[in-house]
Amino acid sequence: MIILPAIDLQNGKCVRLFQGDYATAKVVAESPVETAKQFESQGACWMHMVDLDGAKDGKPRNSEAIFQVLDNVDLHIEVGGGIRDMETVEHYLSRGVSRVILGSAALRDPAFVREAVKKYGKKIAVGIDALDGKVAADGWTEQSQVDYIELAKRMEEIGVHYIICTDIYKVGTMNGPNLVMLDKLNRSVSCNIIASGGVSSLLDIVNLYDLGLYGAIAGKSIYQGALDLRAAIIACQKISSKASKNRTAVDDELERYFRKSDLIPAIIQEESTGEVLMLAYMNRESLVKSM
């Protein structure tokens, strides 16, 4: 799992919001470039940037600040906020942005998302921001009645590879991510899920890793010193290394079984209840498909 430190831009400065309310915007750093350099020095490989003014206005407002960051750090940067047409997508990607995030457009103009994905593939991500499970748009100022899982499934059908999922109630609260919401989403689609909102501790990082998510975004907790970015990145690396070693040990054990027999015993359970349904046997091909 990757950790993406966040920079939210308003009037060219780094700010943080509380529960998505623009009236609560608080400047946490004057210089996006210096902030990005700090993230890079702490081991970040990716960074998440949002043009808050652009998200609200429907067109880029802080692109120059974003380009200054790109010119001064060697990071993969994903950018969202006010990206509503192919011209803007191409504008960002041509300047070196690694991934652009389509938010309101995913809700209102899926044909545009389809076109962008067809042309740029994995360089396109979709941001799904929700209140009480319903998708919000226009910088969180407008609420729809579309369920976040429903929208995610539509995006999966289009071919979207990455979804950034934000529980708006969690934004800026530093009281932990919505694990239930994220787990449900991760189980519902095959897209790579990036968690956003409420991430504030190493325990949160471990919990998100355990869900099998692709990434986690952290902002306010880093600025306030509650989450040590370097420690979070190292923790993910260590957990991943341990999981890899465990997986290798399991693979070795399974290989020993298959050397003795073409079939291995398997306990079949109901996923939702855990009820044991039967004892069966599976071959190597069946095992691979079930993992």
Identify the function of each model-found stretch.
Residues 12-23, 90-93, 97-171:
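Conserved anion-binding
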Residues 112-119, 186, 206-242:
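C-terminal helical cap(s) of enzyme catalytic domains, especially alpha/beta-barrels
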Residues 60-67, 110, 141-150, 175-184:
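Charged helix-capping and loop-helix junction motifs
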Residues 46-64, 104, 109, 164-175:
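Glycine-rich, proline-tolerant flexible connector loops at the mouths of alpha/beta enzymes
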Residues 73-99, 180-218:
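Catalytic cores of alpha/beta
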Residues 8, 39, 47, 79, ...:
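Conserved, mostly hydrophobic/aromatic
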Residues 238-291:
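Flexible "arm" and connector segments at domain edges
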